[in-house]
Amino acid sequence: MSDRQAALDMALKQIEKQFGKGSIMKLGEKTDTRISTVPSGSLALDTALGIGGYPRGRIIEVYGPESSGKTTVALHAIAEVQQQGGQAAFIDAEHALDPVYAQKLGVNIEELLLSQPDTGEQALEIAEALVRSGAVDIVVVDSVAALVPKAEIEGDMGDSHVGLQARLMSQALRKLSGAINKSKTIAIFINQIREKVGVMFGNPETTPGGRALKFYSSVRLEVRRAEQLKQGNDVMGNKTKIKVVKNKVAPPFRTAEVDIMYGEGISKEGEIIDLGTELDIVQKSGSWYSYEEERLGQGRENAKQFLKENKDIMLMIQEQIREHYGLDNNGVVQQQAEETQEELEFEE
């Protein structure tokens, strides 16, 4: 063994002794380099994310205009985590969570941890404590814009507090990012949109809370309403576009189109018809939709209603879509799961 190697081994032993086992290692020695995921609650979004869902141990920012469906997207993620037996927490800085609506989306409100903090510092300290416990699978902060620094709350209405919120977010994310990765917690930060004054060229829109969240986020989702969904004269919901603006774990800039129905959340039937038609699993002739020999209905809304009433056919179409994109029932990319299984068998 060379002197250089002996010196390196001694340094590694010293680092492990001081900071604990696993604090430094060769990348090839890492037990699992693949990213574990949790389904988003939307098949279209799972495919747009490229890895079959939200990556564990990462920060995700969901932003968009008012009433675009940001909280709905986050609540669907909570419902999916709970269905897998995980623990979820919702930090409601806006004090606007509707428990009845959350329950309709599949959230178990009896088990959901809820905090409605008074200040931004309190909200982020609660988030840090939950993440460091290692017992929470997903933490949602709604929203970054509502994280008001203590100095601003205690000050007078006309006082200027330039950069306080940005400084608060920057400090919090520096502390949180490492803990989130170690605990494999999914941290979803919901954010609003503001207009920059005096912008003549380019996009005048920006998100509050400074630049730190943009840097620390592994995934950034932009949620926007595209059009209203009507039944006669009644508005039943909105067609919503979710764009993956940033993605550190798969190719970015993919878009998912979903139907967000009032009182129901993301329509699984709608996205199955859209994805099925796109992949030619569902055939469209004129305004009629059909699957193999079965006619689903005339018009998209009738076809959606048919799938709602015939869950067996819906599941068959869903399985074929998952198979095409290489997703299993948990949203995990099938190829990754098979490779992991092969490695385990080889080790045995």
Swiss-Prot record:
SUPFAM superfamilies, per database record: P-loop containing nucleoside triphosphate hydrolases, RecA protein, C-terminal domain
Presence of the UniProt keyword tRNA-binding in the record: no
A single MF term (Gene Ontology): ATP hydrolysis activity
Induction: By competence, expression activated by ComK. By DNA damage (at protein level).
CDD domains: RecA
Outcome of gene disruption: Cells lacking this gene are extremely sensitive to DNA-damaging agents mitomycin C, methyl methanesulfonate (MMS) and 4-nitroquinolone-1-oxide (4NQO). Double rarA-recA cells are much less viable than recA deletion strains and slightly more sensitive to H(2)O(2), MMS and 4NQO than single recA mutants. A recA deletion suppresses the lethality of pcrA DNA helicase depletion and increases survival of the strain in the presence of H(2)O(2) but not MMS.
Binding residues for ATP: 64-71
Entry-linked Pfam families: RecA, RecA_C
BP GO terms, sorted: DNA recombination; DNA repair; establishment of competence for transformation; SOS response
Family matches, as HAMAP family: RecA (MF_00268)
Protein name as catalogued: Protein RecA
Lineage: Bacteria, Bacillati, Bacillota, Bacilli, Bacillales
